[in-house]
């Protein structure tokens, strides 16, 4: 079975974010980067299916040369080879344009199964994987939390609202978007890191008409949420003093009594 996993590089969760002067995105110059969380789980699920059924895992990522760090980590964890869609501003593409570029990069692979994360940790659109499935004419399921793959079909458990779940059966080839927490992600071993150095990373460039196509959406503004609440310690650890101070504030500021 050939499995293609789509992986996106995003800013590290612990990074201190600064908004660019246009107010449309963050300054990326000094940031550290990592793989989007749910994409990491998609890779782990692909490796588990490969261990069960055999085959090949191909990872595909899009972005500038720094994306190679995500690709190499995936290869070290067990992916067999990689496709890098190279471009400096591809992270700003609309979901439709991104899906079009990614489909063009992997179409000749004729995969049996495509796995993506449910949504990226930056934009969080949750649309790219589904659009890819539509462009490829594949059945798809979203928010997958359990995957049971056999020779020519899948059984997929989907997470719904309010603690409900849903089982789907579908033929292959198919596309799934994977929820975070579906399994325990493995770490790259020293042996895997050394082996990754010999694995193929194929670079492709998206077509100009894909990158430059008109978009039907744009980000007007991003901003940091304003703090509207604050915590104040009353009484300095003394219960009676705290109660008295609270009563005074309720009277003078909240005008409760």
Question: Where does each model-flagged region fall?
Answer:
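N-terminal glycine-rich FAD/FM-binding segment characteristic of electron-transfer flavoproteins
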Residues: 1-257
């Amino acid at each position: 079975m050939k499995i293609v996993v789509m992986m996106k590089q995003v800013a590290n969760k612990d990074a201190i974010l600064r908004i660019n002067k246009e107010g449309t995105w963050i300054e990326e110059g000094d940031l550290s980067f990592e793989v989007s969380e749910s994409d990491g789980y998609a890779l782990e699920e692909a490796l588990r299916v490969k261990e069960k059924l055999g085959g090949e895992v191909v990872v595909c990522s899009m972005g500038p040369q720094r994306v190679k760090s995500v690709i190499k980590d995936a290869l070290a964890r067990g992916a067999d080879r990689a496709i890098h869609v190279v471009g400096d501003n591809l992270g700003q593409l609309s979901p439709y344009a991104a899906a079009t570029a990614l489909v063009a990069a992997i179409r000749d692979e004729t995969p049996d199964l495509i796995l993506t994360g449910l949504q990226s940790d930056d934009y969080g659109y949750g649309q790219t994987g589904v659009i890819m499935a539509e462009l490829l004419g594949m059945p798809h399921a979203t928010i997958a939390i359990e995957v049971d793959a056999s020779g020519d079909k899948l059984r997929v458990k989907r997470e719904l609202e309010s603690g409900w779940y849903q089982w789907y059966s579908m033929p292959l080839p198919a596309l799934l978007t994977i929820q975070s927490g579906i399994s325990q992600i493995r770490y790259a071993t020293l042996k895997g890191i050394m082996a990754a150095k010999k694995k193929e990373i194929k670079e492709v460039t998206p077509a100009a008409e894909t990158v430059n196509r008109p978009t039907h959406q744009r980000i007007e503004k991003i901003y940091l949420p304003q703090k509207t609440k604050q915590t104040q310690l009353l009484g300095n650890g003394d219960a009676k003093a705290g109660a008295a101070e609270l009563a005074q504030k309720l009277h003078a500021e909240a005008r409760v009594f």
